[in-house]
């Protein structure tokens, strides 16, 4: 039992339990849990309601759906939504990512493999090289590409017609997309953090699929501490299940859930030691701010991009920090949460 607890704590230190990026051993589980159609997809109602109309209209006209851009923090279901769209359209989905397409030839190979109406899903589309992106413009707009074959005096341009297709791009950093690329997406979907109610339903669905016994109150408590992110909720559920198995009788109730998450340093607002370190640094070293993002990153020994993409969005969404022109500022809520006295 002691070994299990030590291993539990060790894992929580080596890998941040609240990281909203996909971990290596979670890909199979995510595929298992993935809904197939919009009616099975929990949450993101605004995006779903729009897609229902656009998909139905495209099918009635027997046309390819307009290109779709899905943006928002990691772990909110952008990849899942892409698969759902393809299923709703009744077409194949070809999947790749921005970093995997290093040169124009890589993109041409992918495009040349598409059938009429297919969905091409490009994750991390903001990381496409500019040379590749420029080839994509005509492919998206007019369904053709012109490519250069050969080199020097023997080089020649080849025109290649493409079947109508739907490009679905996913990004965590929509601001990094160039204006010409962004303008070619006819449909945009902002994936937002999930409500506690939606996350509770997701937790209960996951528990049912994996034959776990969980009370509704425990599912709600887990949802509240999952940072509005299904990926994190499902990860925490597995760790709470382990705790219930070793330290209890296997039943996941609210008491077991609280003990397990407390052991993992996940507090009642869904903050972990890194989040708290950010807030404490702002309060103790800079009197609450304003403090620049670069300065803050150096003080907590994290990359600037990591703080900006992984930690800051949730802290802002929960009202613990605000952005100003002069830098980040800790709010009264942050002081109160950490037990500091707040003064104007």
UniProtKB/Swiss-Prot annotation:
Family to which this protein belongs: Belongs to the RuvB family.
Domain comment quoted from the record: Has 3 domains, the large (RuvB-L) and small ATPase (RuvB-S) domains and the C-terminal head (RuvB-H) domain. The head domain binds DNA, while the ATPase domains jointly bind ATP, ADP or are empty depending on the state of the subunit in the translocation cycle. During a single DNA translocation step the structure of each domain remains the same, but their relative positions change.
Record organism: Streptococcus mutans serotype c (strain ATCC 700610 / UA159)
Protein's UniProt name: Holliday junction branch migration complex subunit RuvB
Keyword tags: ATP-binding, Cytoplasm, DNA damage, DNA recombination, DNA repair, DNA-binding, Hydrolase, Nucleotide-binding
Catalytic activity from the UniProt record: ATP + H2O = ADP + phosphate + H(+)
GO molecular function term, any single one: four-way junction DNA binding
Residues covered by region (Large ATPase domain (RuvB-L)): 4-194
Role, per record: The RuvA-RuvB-RuvC complex processes Holliday junction (HJ) DNA during genetic recombination and DNA repair, while the RuvA-RuvB complex plays an important role in the rescue of blocked DNA replication forks via replication fork reversal (RFR). RuvA specifically binds to HJ cruciform DNA, conferring on it an open structure. The RuvB hexamer acts as an ATP-dependent pump, pulling dsDNA into and through the RuvAB complex. RuvB forms 2 homohexamers on either side of HJ DNA bound by 1 or 2 RuvA tetramers; 4 subunits per hexamer contact DNA at a time.
Gene3D superfamilies in the cross-refs: 1.10.8.60, P-loop containing nucleotide triphosphate hydrolases, Winged helix-like DNA-binding domain superfamily/Winged helix DNA-binding domain
């Amino acid at each position: 039992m002691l070994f299990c607890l030590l291993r539990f704590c060790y894992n929580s230190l080596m890998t941040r339990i609240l990281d909203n990026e996909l971990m290596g051993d979670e890909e199979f589980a995510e595929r298992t849990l993935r809904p197939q159609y919009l009616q099975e997809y929990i949450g993101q109602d605004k995006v779903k309601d729009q897609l229902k109309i656009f998909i139905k209209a495209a099918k009635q006209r027997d046309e390819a759906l307009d290109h779709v851009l899905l943006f928002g923090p990691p772990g909110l279901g952008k990849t899942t939504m892409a698969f759902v769209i393809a299923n709703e359209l009744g077409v194949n989905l070809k999947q790749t990512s921005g970093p995997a397409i290093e040169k124009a030839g890589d993109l041409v190979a992918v495009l040349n493999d598409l059938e009429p109406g297919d969905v091409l899903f490009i994750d991390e589309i903001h990381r496409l090289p500019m040379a590749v992106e420029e080839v994509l413009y005509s492919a998206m707009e007019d369904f053709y590409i012109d490519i250069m074959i050969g080199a020097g005096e023997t080089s020649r341009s080849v025109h290649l017609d493409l079947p109508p297709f739907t490009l679905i791009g996913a990004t965590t950093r929509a601001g990094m997309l160039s204006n010409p690329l962004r303008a070619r997406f006819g449909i945009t979907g902002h994936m937002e953090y999930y409500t506690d109610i939606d996350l509770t339903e997701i937790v209960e669905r996951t528990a049912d699929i994996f034959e776990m016994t969980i009370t509704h109150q425990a599912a709600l408590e887990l949802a509240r501490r999952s940072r509005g992110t299904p990926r994190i909720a499902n990860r925490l559920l597995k760790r709470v299940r382990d705790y219930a198995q070793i330290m209890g009788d296997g039943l996941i109730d609210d008491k077991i859930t609280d003990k397990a998450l407390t052991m993992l340093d996940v507090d009642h607002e869904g903050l972990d030691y890194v989040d708290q370190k950010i807030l404490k640094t702002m309060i103790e070293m800079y009197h609450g701010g304003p403090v620049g993002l670069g300065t803050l990153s150096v003080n907590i020994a994290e990359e600037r991009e990591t703080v900006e993409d992984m930690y800051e969005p949730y802290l802002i969404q929960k009202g613990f920090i605000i952005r100003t022109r002069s830098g980040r500022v800790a709010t009264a809520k942050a002081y109160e949460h950490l037990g500091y006295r707040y003064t104007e």
